[in-house]
Design a protein with these regions (language model features):
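N-terminal lobe/hinge region of extracytoplasmic solute-binding protein
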Residues: 38-87, 118, 181-182
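Surface-exposed binding/hinge segments that line
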Residues: 84, 88, 95, 128-169, ...
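Short, well-ordered beta-strand elements
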Residues: 32-42, 91-94, 113-116, 143-145, ...
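Aromatic- and charge-enriched surface segment that lines or borders ligand/interaction sites
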Residues: 81-123
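Ligand-site clamp/hinge motif
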Residues: 202-248, 379-380, 386
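Gly/Pro-rich hinge or "lid" segments in bacterial periplasmic/extracellular proteins
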Residues: 70-74, 159-210, 214, 224, ...
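Sec-dependent signal peptide cleavage junction
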Residues: 22-32
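Append "and occasionally in soluble cytosolic enzymes with long acidic Gly/Pro-rich linkers
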Residues: 278-380
């Protein structure tokens, strides 16, 4: 089984990555109460219903939803203070927090919450992945969702940044460049999809003091370049550094290292057409990947081996799951043999049951250096099983 690794294009690598952030030890940044953060990327547009761009709108302090996850992965209130659901799981009622204003000073009313969610449901083709809405009602401070199908995790669904609450009572015709007006600690001042994006303090923020007057989000795609920018003082915070770059700062009292087990998983998707249309080959590939070694040695503990779509940081019984395709190179070879894969030409690699060479292409994007490391390790592992 021969493998080719092609740089740049599609999908990815592991699971449960550790988010690494570096900041100077002093809380005083250059130019008064401002801060510059080096980020991997931002967004092509600030329209929150486009692709997954609502993630960056929320991640950098602008967007908020009715619920959210805390640092321990627990579901907690945000713009809703509490919620209840019917026994059949088809009716969910959320109490909207009083006294919240959008960053333009407009009151966040239950009616505007409903309008914001209805806008998202109308404009995003991702909504059916979360729930199937029949209707939404408003009664005082309560907003009630009537579902066509039961959903036991409606509160969790609404924590997704896709469902951030924005002011729909204003002119949003230029939202792609100006961004949505939301309730988070910051509001957009300027946006450059390939350069700097600036957010400024929301004077109407409802949940405590906002630490900076403004924050500049500077796109520095390469992790090593981002590390160098932090050392030179070009940026004040470096987000998502490689483990080897983090070691450059370890023990240096001038910097703080903050790390948090991520709620995100990084996947490698298999195309179930062509050669990988054969489930036996897919099973053999999975059993041939030594994810434990990849994460502990190659990524130096910066990730956790995955075995499910959700990471271990979410309490969905991850530790109790049985990985039927755990690393087992001998088992992988046996699966191939049982399915009729044989090394017909004696080159050390099997051909498929019809005698055709098996060539697989691993496609990944290059803004995260660890993906290339993983792809090359996967190539080496699959060579070992033929």
């Amino acid at each position: 089984m021969k493998n080719r690794i092609v740089n740049k294009v599609c999908a990815a690598a592991l699971a449960g990555l550790m988010a690494m952030t570096m900041i100077p030890a002093t809380s005083v940044f250059a130019d008064g109460n401002t801060m510059t953060i080096g980020v991997t990327s931002f967004a092509d547009t600030l329209e929150p219903t486009e692709q997954y761009f609502s993630w960056v709108i929320s991640r950098y302090g602008v967007g908020q939803g009715l619920t959210k996850f805390d640092e321990e992965g627990n579901m907690v209130p945000c713009l809703a203070t509490e919620w209840t659901n019917s026994d059949d799981g088809k009716t969910w009622t959320f109490t909207i927090r009083e006294g919240v204003k959008f960053s333009n000073g407009n009151d966040m009313t239950p009616e505007l919450v409903k309008a914001s969610l209805e806008r998202t449901m109308e404009m995003s083709n991702r909504v059916p992945e979360f729930f199937d809405i029949e209707s939404i009602d408003v009664d005082g401070q309560d907003i009630t969702f009537h579902l066509n199908r039961a959903n036991a995790n409606m509160a969790g669904c609404l924590a997704d940044p896709l469902f951030l609450i924005m002011d729909t009572s204003i002119d949003n015709s230029n939202i792609a460049m100006e961004g949505p007006v939301c309730t988070g600690p910051y509001a957009f001042q300027s946006f450059d999809p390939s350069g700097d994006t600036v957010v400024v303090r929301n004077e109407y923020y409802w949940d405590g003091e906002v630490p900076n007057d403004s924050v500049t989000l500077r796109i520095i795609g390469d992790q090593t370049t981002r590390s160098m920018a932090l050392q030179s003082g070009e940026i004040d915070v470096a987000y998502n550094l490689k483990t080897e770059n983090v070691f450059e700062f370890d023990g240096n009292d001038n910097y703080n290292i903050q790390s948090l087990e991520s709620l995100r998983s990084t996947y490698a998707f298999m195309n179930q057409n062509g050669a990988l249309g054969d489930i036996a080959l897919r099973q053999a590939v999975l059993r041939g990947l030594d994810k434990e070694t990849y994460t502990s040695i190659l990524l130096e503990g910066g990730a956790t081996p995955g075995k499910a779509p959700v990471p271990p940081t979410l309490d969905y019984g991850y530790d109790e799951l049985n990985d039927e395709n755990a690393y087992d190179p001998d088992g992988a070879k046996q699966v191939l043999e049982d399915a009729g894969y044989k090394d017909v030409d004696g080159d050390g690699y099997v051909e498929d049951p019809e005698g055709n060479p098996v060539e697989l292409t691993f496609v990944y994007y290059d803004s995260r250096a660890e993906l290339g490391v993983y792809a090359q390790a996967a190539q080496a592992s699959l060579k070992e099983i033929g």
